[in-house]
Amino acid sequence: MSEISQTVPELVAWARKNDFSISLPVDRLSFLLAVATLNGERLDGEMSEGELVDAFRHVSDAFEQTSETIGVRANNAINEMVRQRLLNRFTSEQAEGNAIYRLTPLGIGITDYYIRQREFSTLRLSMQLSIVAGELKRAADAAQEGGDEFHWHRNVYAPLKYSVAEIFDSIDLTQRIMDEQQQQVKDDIAQLLNKDWRAAISSCELLLSETSGTLRELQDTLEAAGDKLQANLLRIQDATMSHDDLHFVDRLVFDLQSKLDRIISWGQQSIDLWIGYDRHVHKFIRTAIDMDKNRVFAQRLRQSVQTYFDDPWALTYASADRLLDMRDEEMALRDDEVTGELPPDLEYEEFNEIREQLAAIIEEQLAIYKTRQTPLDLGLVVREYLAQYPRARHFDVARIVIDQAVRLGVAQADFTGLPAKWQPINDYGAKVQAHVIDKY
């Protein structure tokens, strides 16, 4: 856990005074990664200038750069790395011209982020949590034993500061890297769906399930150890309450508790957010399949784009929410069977407008039953209405008729507890079970 004691102006002045700057285009970053990879194979962690030039040559070939100026460009790249404090150069009078290079902590940090930290490992996380649990238990035991100031610094503060806090930071870094990986998965899924969503469904499913499993593994591992870690932190906190001179330990324990709570909380929140995204993708796929069963829409859109310069067109929409959610229950009069062109009379009408118009007409016609106090047989009335509409709209029209009818009154036969008879309402097997409405 880093502790920044300087103020912002002090840090700015320090960075300006030392002329800190980092500029890593993709070729320079690739060179740094190549150096780090080769450096990892050295037992002594040292590299000669010739080895750096060889690494630069590999990068130059990969980027298809000219090989005629390889020496000059490699020398410039090495000097730039040294100037940016990514490499340390060591020279001696005995070996003039044969400098030795070592990666700096900054260089190791950057390459470690891109190389080693990209892989999530449940075993690694379990080992980290096991080490933290052991350190916390020993620190809690030492805190309960008590002792002088040296005892508290050596056996309590030091393990918390330089072991527990750093591992917490490592776990936090793992979570942040997984945040980036989630965003990359989202970008990959978007590209797959934009190219050919039918062929991409299986790939999307694989990406979604793998990411969900990784997030769940991480959170389960954290939650399993979280209670024990918090318990030991509370033991240390209780031991410091009777000592007024241990504010530094108490403050560190509070920071660790906050860090642990934040790690576990964000882990669960990340899972919840991913579940929401998972549902969104599946909903999009289902909607696309339902809308375009026969690829009519896709074919028409492709033709429209291809013939745009011959027959220009413009797309205008008034309700973005309806375009995003085509499976809204409020959108009645959907044609689930036919995916071709709409009739000319309905082509430019909103679904809700049609529903409202139809509901108003049916409400006005059914009101006659209430005015005359005439019994309303739902089975007969619904059948009469459905005869006026095509089969594809029978369900929506029947629902509107029934909704308007039950607002007028109730059937006294409903209170007898006896079930009503099933009555056919169209010639395709649809039936309704309802008593005659006779009390308005």
Curated annotation (Swiss-Prot):
Gene Ontology terms describing biological process: cell division; chromosome condensation; chromosome segregation; DNA replication
Keywords for this protein: Calcium, Cell cycle, Cell division, Chromosome partition, Cytoplasm, DNA condensation
Protein location: Cytoplasm, Nucleoid
Main location: cytoplasm
Ranges where the record places region Leucine-zipper: 208-236
Pfam families: KicB, MukF_C, MukF_M
GO cellular component terms attached to this protein's record: cytoplasm; nucleoid
GO molecular function, one term: calcium ion binding
Lineage: superkingdom: Bacteria
Claim: Nucleotidyltransferase is one of the keywords in the record: no
Gene3D superfamilies listed in its UniProt record: Chromosome partition protein MukF, middle domain (1.20.58.590), MukF, C-terminal domain (1.10.225.40), Winged helix-like DNA-binding domain superfamily/Winged helix DNA-binding domain (1.10.10.10)
Positions of disulphide bridges: none
Role summary: Involved in chromosome condensation, segregation and cell cycle progression. May participate in facilitating chromosome segregation by condensation DNA from both sides of a centrally located replisome during cell division. Not required for mini-F plasmid partitioning. Probably acts via its interaction with MukB and MukE. Overexpression results in anucleate cells. It has a calcium binding activity.
Self-association state and partner proteins as the record states: Interacts, and probably forms a ternary complex, with MukE and MukB via its C-terminal region. The complex formation is stimulated by calcium or magnesium. It is required for an interaction between MukE and MukB.
Family listed: Belongs to the MukF family.
UniProt name for this protein: Chromosome partition protein MukF
